[in-house]
Amino acid sequence: MAKSLPLNSRSKTTALKQPRELFSYARDIDGKYVYDDPENSLSYYYLPDSTIDTGIDLQGGYSKFKKIPDEQNLADFNSLLKAIIKYETSEGKKISSDIITFREIMTKILSLPYNLTDPIDLYVVPFDGQLFIKSDDELDMKRRKEQEVRMKQTNTVERYDYMKRCEYVGYKFETIATIPKPWSQVSRSQIENRNKKVVNNYEQYLSVIRTGIGNVKLVLAGEIDCCWDYLPDEQNKKLNHYVELKTSRIIENNSQVVSFEQKLFKAWCQCFLMGVTKIIYGFRDNNLILKNVELFNTEEIPILIKNNPLTNAATEKKINCTNALKWYGAVVDWLNTTVDKKDETKSYRLKYDPVRKSFTLSETESETNEKLRNGELLTPEFTEWRQSLKK
């Protein structure tokens, strides 16, 4: 029997526990995960105005793009659980948390009140007194492939190629806007030759943070694009130095303002959840030339959206970050109280259906539960590790 949470559910509190980084790990150019000295994989932002003014072509190097296959670029629980084992080994105890998942999953939930057209399909697995939440990767991949087919069928060859180049520009912007170490440790040639560097989306630096809303504690893993200035030694101060990088088309009319506001809201969701304080947008024209760069402080975005005169009509569509946060709080609290975290005989499917406008939680079939507990989410290594902590 499925249980439903009405879409108008809102928590009374938006009290958020200040996110704190617990540890980090990384993925290298070969797609292998790195657990020792992951800071070596962190990039640093450096893009002076004089460089921006040169009119950088953000589709440059497109034909050489080293793109990771989509199947290998899903939120990977195997690597996260290995990183958790390493952290718990050093701490000598289990991470204190009610929910363990990836930032991108919670971003979908947080942004749902203003993104009612996209389906959500997740698995919730109770284990060792905690809820582990992952995407239904098989269904996600099926949808991605269907979307790709639709893009090809509904666009000319030229238009399809342009759309793929638009996807590339975000990675290109990251490449030309960052350096591998703090500025003082990087050679002039490294800085000047960034535009010639082969772009890839294999390399990732991932931060794992503890946060919470209301009475629920969460551990979230999410990709960090780069560091603003330097990385402090104190673990609990690192989040203030991280930056999210984004690209968007330059804004030339009112309808584009509304479209950008929706993008900015999604970026706010991503960064707010992780405690990332800065978002840098690279704005490009229709020819994919970088025209200007703008810095947004995460904490100021709700006010920017609220005070936008172009969307200030009193409608339900008007984005309200506090309203989204109250929905997120209601979902997290509902999961935490509805699912028995000690019952390891069951797993659940959490589903948002955009056609029925329903948000439901239902038990999976026993076969699915077995798969999730034996490699698809939980790994034998992690299960054994947690058992050893009880001895």
Swiss-Prot record:
EC number: 3.6.1.-
Keywords: Hydrolase, Metal-binding, mRNA processing, Nuclease, Nucleotide-binding, Nucleus, RNA-binding
Co-factor note (free text): Divalent metal cation.
GO biological process: cleavage in ITS2 between 5.8S rRNA and LSU-rRNA of tricistronic rRNA transcript (SSU-rRNA, 5.8S rRNA, LSU-rRNA); deadenylation-independent decapping of nuclear-transcribed mRNA; mRNA processing; NAD-cap decapping; nuclear polyadenylation-dependent rRNA catabolic process; nuclear-transcribed mRNA catabolic process; positive regulation of termination of RNA polymerase II transcription; termination of RNA polymerase II transcription, poly(A)-coupled
One of the Pfam families matching this protein, by short name: RAI1
Gene Ontology molecular functions: enzyme regulator activity; metal ion binding; mRNA 5'-diphosphatase activity; nucleotide binding; phosphodiesterase decapping endonuclease activity; RNA binding; RNA NAD+-cap (NAD+-forming) hydrolase activity
Cofactor or coenzyme needed: a divalent metal cation
Signal peptide start-end: none
GO CC aspect terms: cytosol; Las1 complex; nucleus; RNA polymerase II termination complex
Main EC class the enzyme belongs to: hydrolase
Binding site for a divalent metal cation: E174, D225, E244, L245
Subunit structure: Interacts with RAT1; the interaction is direct, stabilizes RAT1 protein structure and stimulates its exoribonuclease activity. The interaction also stimulates RAI1 pyrophosphohydrolase activity, probably by recruiting it to mRNA substrates.
Family: Belongs to the DXO/Dom3Z family.
Name used for this protein in its record: Decapping nuclease RAI1
Native species: Candida albicans (strain SC5314 / ATCC MYA-2876) (Yeast)
